[in-house]
Amino acid sequence: MELNLEIVTTPLRPAATVVMLRDAPVGLEVFLMKRHTLSDVLGGAYVFPGGKVDAADTEIDMAAYLDQPLRLLHAGLNEADISERTAGGLYVAALREAFEESGVLFAQGFATLDIDAVRAATLLREGHGFNAVLARMALRLQTRSLVPWSRWITPTAPSVMNKRFDTRFFVSAVPAGQVAIHDNHETTDSIWLSPRSALQQYWAGQIELAPPQIMSLAHLARHAAVDSVLSAARGRRPPVIQPEPFDHGGQRVICYPGDTRHSVSEQALPGPTRLSYRNKRFEPDAGFEALFL
């Protein structure tokens, strides 16, 4: 992964990501997709489904198409400085991006619990917008399926891209009976891996990961099952992670809350408090196992 040294002063773009999980014989697994190599955001890297908030995400009739009142969604994010509608839009964006990028539809019918995700995907390909698909199929989005996990704010020195995002990460169990798959447009490959296996493949040079994915996978690796992740997420406030990069001896270092160089002294995530850029990738100074200490 190439290092970006550009300073970016453009406003933050609100975004949302869904970390989809499942229980497998080997334990907890997470869904990752490979961004198209020509993408202007993390091209070639493996990421969780997600993207920026669109205007339509906040324009939807939330009382009709969401399964929870906005006040509960707002409370779940624990962000006093945003409106309830903005909070609702973040949930909608997360669910929309999950569907558009992986084909997984977190929804239920108004009159039945059954949904036809294949038909919904067909309508989307035919040019119907996400909100129109919900209306046409009489679907209500299942915001209860999402639990806020963390909030990542890109610094003005992004290190791996030239855009800045204010991204809310949600965790969720993939719905039973649905198959997550890359869209062959924005993403070109997809895989289910245990968090540790994903990091092992990254360490071996088999896949590329950006720092937020590295740190998130290291966090998830501490859990053995989906219920453990969801329970932990429900039992705490989603931490705000604003990385603070600096250069040390000609080497780019990204530090996180709790690091001696970070402005926030309290550690927000388990694992290392800094990653250093070596061999065209970011890694902890103490080696691979430091991700799990």
Identify what each model region corresponds to.
Residues 1-293:
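N-terminal leader/linker segments that precede catalytic domains of diphosphate-processing enzymes
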